[in-house]
Amino acid sequence: MIYLKYNCPLTYLILLKLEGGKTVEEKTDAEQRNATSEEDTEIFENPGEGLEKATFAAGCFWGIEEAFRQIKGVVATAVGYSGGHFKRPTYEQVCTLDTGHAEAVRVIFDPEIVSYKTLLDVFWKIHDPTTKDRQGPDVGKQYRSVIFYHSDEQKAAALASKEELEKSGAFKNPVVTEIVPVSEFYMAEDYHQQYFEKKGFLQNIFRSFKK
């Protein structure tokens, strides 16, 4: 695998759009789920037959979620808080108190369409896994790089993927990404869910390229 160091989800999404979606296929509106509707929240704990869960932390969860939402085979996404010791934290508490949580993205996917390895490949591309407790200007433990595995198979895949990345020489500095068992995932407030989509952020950027 060739590791292209986009280092942030926005760069990845813009390049994906400019390349015509050759890396991963863009989904139609009909395929995208609204994670915050009442009927859909259950899917993030109990996906149902034929679906699997993945959980990642890679900095501010807004852009990370949007990157995973573009992948064919991803059925639903939600942002939340994981890896901490504080029950049902709010965004303000995660940002200002030592709750130990990371801003995380829960991904529900169909392994018949997209593999967990593909999700790992995207994860490495959309952030800098060599910076501890920060991504770009965002500094704090909540912005740390983490792969939360849901099974022994995911753990093995994550460790192998990390080793492959380290051997590739793509990064000069050591990879500091944590690979840990999944812990309680607390859904973030509604206004954080699909933030880029709600704000039309990417659409405005893409329109500017056409001018």
From Swiss-Prot:
Gene Ontology MF: a single term: peptide-methionine (S)-S-oxide reductase activity
Which cysteine residues pair off into disulfide bonds?
A: none
> What domain of life?
Archaea
Q: Which Pfam families match?
A: PMSR (PF01625)
What span is annotated as the signal peptide, if there is one? none
Q: Which InterPro entries match?
A: Met_Sox_Rdtase_MsrA_dom, Met_Sox_Rdtase_MsrA_sf
Give the reaction(s) catalysed. Answer: L-methionyl-[protein] + [thioredoxin]-disulfide + H2O = L-methionyl-(S)-S-oxide-[protein] + [thioredoxin]-dithiol; [thioredoxin]-disulfide + L-methionine + H2O = L-methionine (S)-S-oxide + [thioredoxin]-dithiol
The record's Gene3D superfamilies line, in alphabetical order, gives: Peptide methionine sulphoxide reductase MsrA
Q: What is its EC number?
A: 1.8.4.11
Q: What class of enzyme is it?
A: oxidoreductase
Q: Where along the chain is the active site annotated?
A: 60
Any single biological process term in GO: protein modification process
UniProt KW keywords: Oxidoreductase
Q: What is the role of this chain?
A: Has an important function as a repair enzyme for proteins that have been inactivated by oxidation. Catalyzes the reversible oxidation-reduction of methionine sulfoxide in proteins to methionine.
Q: Which family does it belong to?
A: Belongs to the MsrA Met sulfoxide reductase family.
| Protein name per the record | Peptide methionine sulfoxide reductase MsrA
Q: Which organism is it from?
A: Methanosarcina mazei (strain ATCC BAA-159 / DSM 3647 / Goe1 / Go1 / JCM 11833 / OCM 88) (Methanosarcina frisia)
Write the gene name.
Answer: msrA
